[in-house]
Amino acid sequence: RDGAELRCANGSKLRARYVVSAVPFSVLREIDITPALRGDQADAVKRMPYHNQSQVWLRAKKPYWEEDGIEASMWSDGPFTLIRQQIEHDGTRELMSVLAFGPNSRRLDKLPPAERGRIALDYIHKVRPSTVGRLELVGTHSWELVPTIRGCSHQFVPGRGVAWSRAMALPHERLHFAGEHVRRLEVGMESAMETGERAALQILEKLSA
């Protein structure tokens, strides 16, 4: 009654007066919470789906877009939805992110990283011949394969959007919620950080009462 206890995977225990959880619901639903969540909040944590994004990162050794005169980034209806050139703050244009979503990403994730890279390069070479010999693999990443995240971003299911959005960020006993999944605006990590500020202010208000 005077605080909360967290039991960690390594067996250690932590105690605090209040807890802020930014754990995605894709992972939170597998963590025991006592007393249990209730109503629409419990339903959101249990059933909210997450979509995946599998990434292959490439480096352009030469500016292939200057050879064929076409914008470097591309949309595709093939296995990779988006081939996106990263433009850094200093104007560097070497890095390319190759993104697969949904079923395409899950098929890709079953393969070793090197094989994912090979498939991405083969596909880009096929649809954009000017890239042959001008791209090299840097690495791969999949949000769904990260055990503490298990998905790129959350989705609302039909008929539950209003109920979930109203309930899922509400404090539960001494547990408060933050993170991109309880943001109110779709403006990236800035909005996710705002949820942390909101949770902190909720706790400060309780501490000062």
Regions inferred by a protein language model and the residue ranges of each:
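Solvent-exposed residues in well-ordered beta-strands and their adjoining turns
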Residues: 9, 59-61, 101
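Central beta-strand plus flanking loop segment that forms part of the substrate or channel wall
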Residues: 40-68
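Short glycine/proline- and charge-enriched loop/turn segments
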Residues: 35-42, 154-158
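Glycine-centered loop/turn positions within well-structured domains
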Residues: 4, 12, 26
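Conserved flavin/dinucleotide-binding core of flavoenzymes
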Residues: 3-5, 22, 52, 68-209
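Core beta-strand elements of the Rossmann-like FAD/NAD(P) dinucleotide-binding domain
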Residues: 9-18
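Flavin (primarily FAD) binding-site architecture
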Residues: 18-40, 57
